[in-house]
């Protein structure tokens, strides 16, 4: 619990959780399935971004986020990188975000959070192989949809 509040304060620069966020964070850290329904701007992202940084929970490894909105993924990754959080993304468009270095970091479990478009998660053999490897090595912390 101390680590959770430390990350909230020191990494995300927030003093407190919004309604239901702490419960969602603690549940995912206990490796429970979590369903979070909040309005836009309600704080859903923190419910998976913060646990991705906690090293003392039951879940360790990379958090994979499936998102259909490329611009949202780009914004989230930039926001996380600005906080020195190891994050990357792979979209259906490929291109610059698909560089070999980011793929290597994902494959080796060095990223805290990876955003994937549904198309990349579903149709890319490489992404499915990486996720399977991480899962088999207990390095896949959670999948967020």
Predicted regions located by residue number:
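SF2 helicase catalytic motif II
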Residues: 111-112, 119-145
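Conserved pre-motif I regulatory segment
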Residues: 1-39
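Conserved motor-coupling elements within RecA-like helicase/translocase cores
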Residues: 99-114
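Short hydrophobic/charged patches on amphipathic alpha-helices used for structural packing
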Residues: 25-26, 100-103, 128, 132
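Conserved SF1/SF2 helicase motif Ia
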Residues: 37-42, 47-86, 109-112, 141
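Alpha-helical scaffold elements adjacent to nucleotide-binding pockets in ATP/GTP-utilizing enzyme cores
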Residues: 75-80, 101-102, 130, 144
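Conserved helicase motor
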Residues: 90-100, 118-123
């Amino acid at each position: 619990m101390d680590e959770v509040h430390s990350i909230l304060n020191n990494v995300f620069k927030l003093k407190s959780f919004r309604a239901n966020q702490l419960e969602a964070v603690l549940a995912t850290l206990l490796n429970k399935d979590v369903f979070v329904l909040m309005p836009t701007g309600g704080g859903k992202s923190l419910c998976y971004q913060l646990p991705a940084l906690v090293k003392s929970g039951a879940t360790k490894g990379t958090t994979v986020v499936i998102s259909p909105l490329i611009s949202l993924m780009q914004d989230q990754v930039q926001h996380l990188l600005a906080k020195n959080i190891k994050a990357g993304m792979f979209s259906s468009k490929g291109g610059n975000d698909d560089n070999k270095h980011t793929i290597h970091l994902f494959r080796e479990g060095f990223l805290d959070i990876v955003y994937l478009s549904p198309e990349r998660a579903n149709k890319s053999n490489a992404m499915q192989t990486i996720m399977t490897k991480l899962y088999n090595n207990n390095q896949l912390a959670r999948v967020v949809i």
